[in-house]
Structure formats: C-alpha cells, structure tokens
Amino acid sequence: MGQELSQHERYVEQLKQALKTRGVKVKYADLLKFFDFVKDTCPWFPQEGTIDIKRWRRVGDCFQDYYNTFGPEKVPVTAFSYWNLIKELIDKKEVNPQVMAAVAQTEEILKTSSHTELTTKPSQNPDLDLISLDSDDEGAKGSSLKDKNLSCTKKPKRFPVLLTAQTSADPEDPNPSEVDWDGLEDEAAKYHNPDWPPFLTRPPPYNKATPSAPTVMAVVNPKEELKEKIAQLEEQIKLEELHQALISKLQKLKTGNETVTSPETAGGFSRTPHWPGQHIPKGKCCASREKEEQTPKDIFPVTETVDGQGQAWRHHNGFDFTVIKELKTAASQYGATAPYTLAIVESVADNWLTPTDWNTLVRAVLSGGDHLLWKSEFFENCRETAKRNQQAGNGWDFDMLTGSGNYSSTDAQMQYDPGLFAQIQAAATKAWRKLPVKGDPGASLTGVKQGPDEPFADFVHRLITTAGRIFGSAEAGVDYVKQLAYENANPACQAAIRPYRKKTDLTGYIRLCSDIGPSYQQGLAMAAAFSGQTVKDFLNNKNKEKGGCCFKCGRKGHFAKNCHEHIHNNSETKAPGLCPRCKRGKHWANECKSKTDSQGNPLPPHQGNGLRGQPQAPKQAYGAVSFVPANKNNPFQSLPEPPQEVQDWTSVPPPTQY
C-alpha cells in the first residue's frame, strides 16, 4: 500500500509539473481528489493500464452520464476543467517529452496498482466492493489513497456490486494475460448507461485468485423506478378520494339527510331536474376534491342526489365565499347594474336558489338602501306572479315565492318544484335590474341627451337602459325611445337621420350615425365657423335651394328670362291684323310708326310717353331773364351778338318733343 501511495503521489506531482509547463497552475490536493473521483465513476479505468485519447474520452462520457443522473451537486466543480486539461496533454504528448514521460509512468503505475488491488485488497477485507457506482454522500464517493492508508473501514454503497458469486478453484476462470481488455471497456461502459438493458452476467475476472464476492443484483432502471412511484401515488390519490367521500357520507348520515348504500355509490351523482340550457349543479361530496377547479357558478345551495336505489335526496349547501366576493367586487367597482355584474348574477341565478338564499346574497353584496329597494321590487314582482298562479290554479302563492309564513324554513323551501324556482329567479333578477345607477339624477328619459363627442350608439344604450328602468322593459316604450333618440341627439346626428327619419327604425338610426365621430364633428365646426353660422343653422341651411323666385310665374329655381311658361305663352298669342291707325300694315297700333295714313293724311302723334329718345336742351329759352350784365370784360361773353332784351312770359305751350 505504501508503494502504491508513493507511485500515485509521484505521478500526480509529474502531472502537476506537466500542466505547469503549459502555464496552468493546479493544486496537488485538487488533483488527488480528481483522480479519486475518476476511480469512483470509472472503476474500469485504473485496471486497463493504458492512457490514450480514446479511453480518456470514455472517461468524459462517464462524467457526463454521472452529471445527468445525479445532478451538479454530486460532481466536483473542477472535474470537467481538469479533464479538459489532461485531454490537451494527451493530445500533445508526442510533442512534449515531459508529458510523454508522465503518461508512460502513469500507465505503469495503473498496471501495477490494478494487479495490487486484485491481490491485496480482498485478503484484507473480503467484503470490500470492487466496483462501486456511487456512494451516499459526496465525501464517501471514493476515498483517496491517503484516506485508505489511514482507515480501511467499509463505507455503505448505494448500488450493488457487479460481480457474481464464484470460488477461487473455478477451472473456467481465464488467465489475466488472456483477457480481452478492449471488449471489457464496452461492457463496463454499459454499467453507466440507463438505456442499456440490465447486465445480469458477470464480467470475466481480472485475477484467477479472486475470492468469492456477494451475489450480483441488476442495476435499477430510473425510468422503471419512476413509473412505480407514479403508480403508487395514483393509488394513494384514489384511496384518499374514497376516504373523503366516506367522511362526507358519514356527516350526511348524522344530519339525517341521506342513506348509505355502498362505498361505490357513497358519493352518489348529482341530478337536478332542469330545462334545456340549464347548468347541472354539483354535489358537496366532491367539493373538497375539486376546490381548485371550481368557478363561482359551480357551487350552488340546493342540489339533488340520487342514491343507488334510485331514491332522490335534496340537500342545501351554503354559498361559497368566492361567489360572494366576486359579486361584491363587481358591484362595488362597476355598479350593481353593470353588464359584468349582471352576467355573474345570471350565472348564479340559472340554478336553484331559495328565497332565503336570494335575500342572503343581496344583503351581503349590496348596500343597505339597495337591499331595501331590491326587496320591495322583489315582493311586488312576487305579488304579480302569485296573481297569475292563482288564475292558473297551480297553488304557488305569495308565501311560497317570498319564503314567508309556513315556508320560512330552509327545509320547506328545498322541496319546491323546479318551476317555482324558475319563477323566483325571474322575480329576483327583474328586481335586480331595476336598481338605480349611483350618481344618476333621476330616471328621466327627457334628460338623457347626446353629448357633442359622444357616439350615437352609446347614447342610445343609455336611453334604452333608462327606459328599461322606467317601463320595466325597453320594448314597451320603443316608439318613445325612437322619438327621443332623434330629438335628443346632437345636430350632426339629427342632420344624418332627418332624411330617413320615417323610413327606418332605431337600428337604422344607429347605422346612419355610425361614422359620425370626433373628426366629423371637428370638420363640421370649422365649416360652420367659416360660414359665420352655428353648427345647427349650418346643417339646416346646407340643403336649401339657392336663388330667388321667378317674377313672371312666381316659382323658384329660375329667373324671368329663363321662364319656360312665359315663352310658351308668347308662342300661343294671336298675330296682329290690319293696323287701325294707318290702314297700311299688319301690326299693332301702339307699334305703328307711320306719319300718314293710307289716304296720305297726316297722322297725329302718339299720345303718352311712347318711345322717347334722349332729352335735348332747348334751342331758345322762353320767359328766361338774363341776369348777366353786359360787360366787355366778361370772359363768358365771347360772341359778338347783340344783347337780348328782357322778354315777358308767354302762354305758348311747351314743345311736344325736344
């Protein structure tokens, strides 16, 4: 053993020097730990006695398999780094003489240590494992040579020994010199590959004098072991489910609601008489198992279970807190009549809820005032329903609908017929929809008006919602809503609806105004500003016909010169006959220009204005007095005519023509 330690230490020292020549500094203790790890993961490596690139790469494959199997926490940090450094040394051993000498000495040490381990170790401890795949802890994977010199105690191994029981006197054991070492490499590599089938035959012994070893056990395949664990877990889950079902059944027996038939039918199955489209509720027996998969609509108060004998049992469960929490959050954030809140209410109301359940749910979700409003509307709806039931003669009175009087207990309400549950649902949801919106200043339809930039569809939605609260249903006042949809719309939407107002319905209004948005409003405001009008006046005057009326026919659209009626009337007038004035042509008398008649007698001039020419200045002034004195120095008196005397006024009439 001491000789082995000295040779091993000398080899490690030479390897350290060889690495140092390549500029790599390593610690002596780290190299010792590395080769201890090599011996633990590759027990076949020291026994071959040859170091070449092929075997060293096989060592690297063993490292990788060990890493994939046990994880990084079982592999030293420097294992792969040292493996790469030694691989480079082996690749270049022909170039560096020092490296070649170190490799040769290492091969000699491996051969010597291989034969020494086979002859000495079994004599010292016959129960010592020869080939070990892994240990329980990282420090016990394979002790170094120094640790073996100090302590030879046996360490527990996780995997069994890969040897079969044999005797030293077996005549079939071959000579170590005749062993095919290359073939053994492939067989030993199979020990670490989980994809290979279990190796059940023993490998050829390296030494004929090897004592007997424990019996070989096959290496457990990790996949098979994992499948066994999964099967065990599945069986455990099934047993736990059956255990929970039996506990639930026992609790129901104590309350006197059900009878037990057998473990197979202990859970029973949920059956609820339902109409088409109704969600079938689930029983409480599976609540603990499906708690993580439940949604608010999967937990309902009243359910009906049928046992193995075909007998139906009804039982009542309390509301799940997730339902109340979700509905409370929706009512607080979005409002009691918001679409999301109503969707949750309808989802819960699709199943069997007693009047007490409705009262509990509303009191927990809504405020005090809203709860009272809902309760008053609910009672009013129940009175109307009770009157119809009385006329139909089905016996479902007001006390049954409201859960009062003889039907105030939960046990009595659980026995209701499915049709009665449907009437309670309709009355409760109708009362919920009539709850007022917070911040709404009264439910007045005339006060609902479209904003300047509000889409027309949103405005109609607000109008229909308000009408539904007032009339109970928007269909009841659809004509009134249509009228207000036009009158309370903004000017742009009114202008778009006006030509088709009496030709389409409310959906047509929405389609006509679908393209009217902020950009349209902005362009319309700019056009009205440029024309100096308001938006409303601009839209009202935009389609009016331009131009005045015709002065001849009084109609719009043309002028008098283009009047077709005047031209048509002129074409129908009679032709003039013989002129009564001159008796010489066919023309009208007012158009006659003759001076004499057909006999040659002079004709008097036309009376009246007639056709007058340009007025002319008189050639002689009558009755005018010259106030300009006669003076030779007057520049305006240039003619050598004698001055006129003052004339008196005369009675001569003015000339007829100028």
Swiss-Prot record:
A lipid is attached at residue 2 (N-myristoyl glycine). Keywords: Capsid protein, Cleavage on pair of basic residues, Coiled coil, Host-virus interaction, Lipoprotein, Metal-binding, Myristate, Phosphoprotein, Repeat, Viral budding, Viral budding via the host ESCRT complexes, Viral matrix protein, Viral nucleoprotein, Viral release from host cell, Virion, Zinc, Zinc-finger. A zinc finger (CCHC-type) spans 548-565, 577-594. A motif (PTAP/PSAP motif) lies at residues 211-214. One of its GO terms (molecular function) is nucleic acid binding. Residues 217-258 form a coiled coil. Pfam families: Gag_p10 (PF02337), Gag_p24 (PF00607), Gag_p24_C (PF19317), zf-CCHC_5 (PF14787). Gene3D superfamilies: 1.10.1200.30, Human Immunodeficiency Virus Type 1 Capsid Protein, Retroviral GAG p10 protein, Zinc finger, CCHC-type. Signal peptide: none annotated. GO terms for cellular component: viral nucleocapsid. Residues 113-126 have a biased composition (Polar residues). The record marks 100-101, 163-164, 217-218, 300-301, 526-527, 622-623 as: Cleavage. This is Gag polyprotein. GO terms for biological process: viral budding via host ESCRT complex; viral translational frameshifting. Residues 101-162 form a propeptide. Residues 138-149 have a biased composition (Basic and acidic residues). Residues 113-149, 258-281, 593-658 are annotated as: Disordered. The gene is gag. The keyword Ion transport does not apply. A motif (PPXY motif) lies at residues 203-206.
